Design a protein with these regions (language model features):
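Ferredoxin-type iron-sulfur electron-transfer modules and their immediate structural context
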Residues: 1-40, 44, 103-119, 161, ...
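Mobile, glycine- and charge-enriched loop segments
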Residues: 106-141
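Non-catalytic interaction/regulatory modules that flank or connect domains
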Residues: 132, 140-144, 148, 153
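Cofactor-cradling patches in redox/metallo enzymes
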Residues: 147-184
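A contiguous, basic/glycine-rich beta-loop/short-helix subdomain that forms a polymer-engagement track
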Residues: 77-101
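Iron-sulfur cluster-binding cysteine motifs and their immediate structural context
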Residues: 32-56, 61, 65-83
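Gly-rich Lys/Arg/Thr-decorated short loops/hinges at beta-loop-alpha junctions or inter-strand turns
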Residues: 15-21, 48, 125-132
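Flexible loop/turn segments at secondary-structure boundaries
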Residues: 25-26, 48, 62, 77-78, ...
């Protein structure tokens, strides 16, 4: 424990959200419009700031709920960067289908609870059915309408989401996005 006092350095907290205030629909001329990111942030890291919103990177826990419900794309989940998530999704589904796989069901799970549950199923049971493809993400709540529709476009028959009990308070935005995708 005394060795800790000699440790010197920096800690860099990741910035989970990229925010483009130019396309934010929060407010204009003092008239409030969209508040979806504020309403769905479980940590309170997003606050109104005039005609835009302010993201506090030190409070943000990186759940991605804000990005998944943002109608304009002003809030974008930054991890992984760019199109990495969609490229992984497309590659996995194309490979499965090209190998003769049928009726792919995508199981979206986080890297903590989800991976542990899938491992437990493999150790203590028969594992996942052959047509259920696990897809690991940083936080399940980061997926939104764009991801759900892309999964269907890339060949997924269904998208299943494994959400840990500790995240049950963060599911409202995700459920709204899933209902919208189902309607489309």
């Amino acid at each position: 424990l005394l060795e800790l006092t000699d440790m010197v350095g920096e800690f860099q907290k990741p910035r989970y959200v990229d925010y483009d205030e130019a396309i934010c629909a929060h407010a204009s001329a003092g008239i409030t419009g969209c508040t979806r990111c504020i309403d769905n942030c479980p940590t309170g890291a997003i606050t109104p700031d005039g005609d835009k919103v302010n993201f506090d990177p030190y409070i943000c826990a990186g759940c991605g709920a804000c990005a998944s419900v943002c109608p304009t794309g002003a809030a974008r989940y930054a991890l992984p960067a760019g199109d990495t998530l969609f490229n992984r999704l497309r590659t996995m589904l194309r490979t499965y289908l090209a190998a003769g796989g049928k009726n792919p069901n995508l199981l979206v799970a986080d890297t903590e609870y989800g991976d542990d549950m899938i491992d437990a199923m493999a150790r203590n049971g028969g594992g996942l059915p052959a047509n259920v493809l696990p897809f690991s993400v940083n936080e399940v709540t980061m997926i939104g309408l764009d991801f759900l529709l892309a999964a269907g476009a890339f060949g997924a028959e269904r998208v299943l989401v494994l959400l840990g009990p500790q995240k049950s308070g963060e599911k409202d935005g995700l459920e709204d996005e899933m209902a919208l995708a189902e309607a489309i």
